[in-house]
């Protein structure tokens, strides 16, 4: 697994597998327990397909009581648990472990309530992101966060990763659009955080859960904000001779006080791949392409379009195409949202990175990526949530060529180090998972990481939920002064602790 270190499987748990499977069948009867090798292969990886592992067993509960009972059983018996939504994580956040129960939430797929007067929907975590919008669009509403995988990704996974999308610049990430959740702790306890009402007292545990990557609990119900569709939405497609000019245009648009509904950028390799795949009319004679969407009352949109076009011209734009219909606006976005599968047509494999930088540093980072591309001898196609500086470099490689996966991972790590160096962060919306786990010390010092681990320990003292993710290895509750001695034996007795 290209040098990736994961927790050692618990031999005692592996030996008890048959009994564990039988016990879980008593909790989740029928077809809710999957334990054959062939059937479990469906779950051996998520969107980060470079790393694969079969779970101990797969459990697919249908009720909150079943989730609670499974987690309580695992807690009482010292069995690790890996929660899984739709399996679209690009950071390996739901990669299974050989000694862990994979808890799949796909059967929690119902929309429980739509409350138009309060502009909220109550949904189960297995509902797809796009499914929420589909359920309310006939009344003129929609759910704002829209990651490229919205047709497949689940709202539960969106909460775990704090997903964004092309419209998060104006309408926020998942954290800004989730009002409440029901969750189950590893001990089996069920609690509610937030809801339809204003909830400002006490600690912001709802905010803590959003983006916690399955380390603190399992979400079983989510209350989300739904918005009315804007009166008008139009998109401007602007081409530039260089990525640096496009990046400066982005900074100038925001600097002018304009907050577009969405603002995305692609470089030449991504433009060509998307156009060959979707055929929406992207210009192929430019080095960088901006898609800027303005929404609101028609008179305001017209004014903002003029302002954006003027800023683009000042930055040397060579192409400017304004959508003339809703179909054309959607077509502009279709190419951008298809960028990932489009790149998959021109390369056997690719890694999708997810760093975030200050907007003003975009030209510097793009220049650095070109140098890294030459250093590693690997191509890179770039797509960005340009408005908030969230980069998605796609590193193209061939896993069949010895050493290319490792080179791609090293290339990606250097990109993320560059992001941190210029004042950015390791992830914007894909999460840390296993992909960025060992880069956490690039951004956080020992005290930072220890305090984060203390929060983890408050929810999960035995470190059973999604182990091996987010935190660098050998960072456990025991190192923070909390030790768990089981049957008179200290776990990992050979590990220096003091």
Which residue stretches match the model-derived regions?
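Noncatalytic alpha-helical scaffold of FAD-dependent oxidoreductases
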Residues: 1-498
């Amino acid at each position: 697994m290209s040098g990736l270190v994961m927790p050692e499987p618990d031999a005692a748990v592996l030996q008890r597998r048959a009994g564990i499977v039988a016990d879980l069948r008593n909790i989740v009867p029928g077809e809710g327990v999957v334990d054959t090798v062939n059937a479990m292969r469906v779950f051996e990886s998520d969107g980060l397909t470079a790393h694969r592992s079969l779970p101990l067993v797969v459990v697919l509960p249908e009720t909150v009581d079943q989730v609670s009972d499974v987690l309580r059983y695992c807690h009482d018996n010292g069995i690790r648990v890996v929660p899984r939504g739709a399996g679209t994580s690009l950071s390996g956040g739901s990669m299974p472990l050989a000694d862990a129960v994979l808890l799949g939430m796909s059967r929690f797929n119902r929309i429980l309530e739509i409350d138009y007067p309060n502009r909220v929907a109550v949904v189960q975590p297995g509902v797809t992101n796009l499914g929420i919008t589909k359920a309310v669009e006939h009344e003129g509403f929609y759910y704002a966060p829209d990651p490229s995988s919205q047709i497949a990704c689940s709202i539960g996974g969106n909460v775990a990763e704090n997903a964004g999308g092309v419209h998060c610049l104006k309408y926020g990430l998942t954290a800004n659009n989730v009002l409440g959740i029901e969750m189950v702790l590893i001990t089996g306890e069920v609690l509610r955080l937030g809801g339809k009402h204003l909830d400002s007292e006490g600690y912001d545990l709802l905010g803590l859960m959003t983006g916690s990557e399955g380390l603190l609990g399992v979400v079983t119900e989510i209350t989300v904000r739904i918005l009315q569709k804007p009166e008008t939405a139009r998109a401007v497609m602007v081409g530039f001779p260089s990525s640096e000019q496009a990046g400066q245009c982005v900074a100038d648009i925001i600097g002018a006080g304009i907050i577009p509904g969405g603002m995305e950028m692609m470089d030449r390799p991504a433009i060509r791949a998307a156009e060959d795949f979707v055929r929406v009319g992207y210009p192929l004679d430019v080095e960088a392409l901006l898609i800027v969407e303005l929404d609101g009352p028609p008179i305001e949109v017209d004014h903002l379009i003029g302002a954006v076009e003027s800023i683009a011209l000042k930055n040397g734009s060579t192409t400017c195409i304004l959508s003339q219909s809703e179909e054309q606006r959607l077509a502009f976005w279709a190419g951008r949202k298809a960028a990932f599968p489009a790149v998959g047509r021109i390369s056997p494999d690719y890694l999708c990175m997810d760093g975030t930088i200050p907007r003003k540093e975009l030209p510097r980072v793009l220049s650095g990526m070109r140098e890294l591309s030459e250093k590693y001898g690997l191509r890179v196609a770039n797509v960005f949530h340009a408005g908030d500086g969230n980069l998605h470099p796609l590193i193209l490689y061939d896993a069949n060529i010895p050493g290319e996966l490792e080179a791609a991972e090293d290339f990606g790590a250097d990109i993320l180090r560059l992001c941190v160096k210029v004042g950015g962060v390791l992830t914007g919306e894909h999460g840390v998972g296993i992909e960025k786990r060992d880069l956490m010390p690039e951004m956080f010092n020992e005290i930072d990481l220890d305090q984060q681990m203390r929060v983890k320990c408050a929810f999960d003292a035995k470190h059973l939920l999604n182990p091996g993710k987010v935190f660098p290895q050998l960072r456990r509750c025991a190192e923070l002064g909390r030790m768990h001695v089981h049957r008179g034996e200290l776990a990992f007795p050979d590990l220096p602790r003091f």
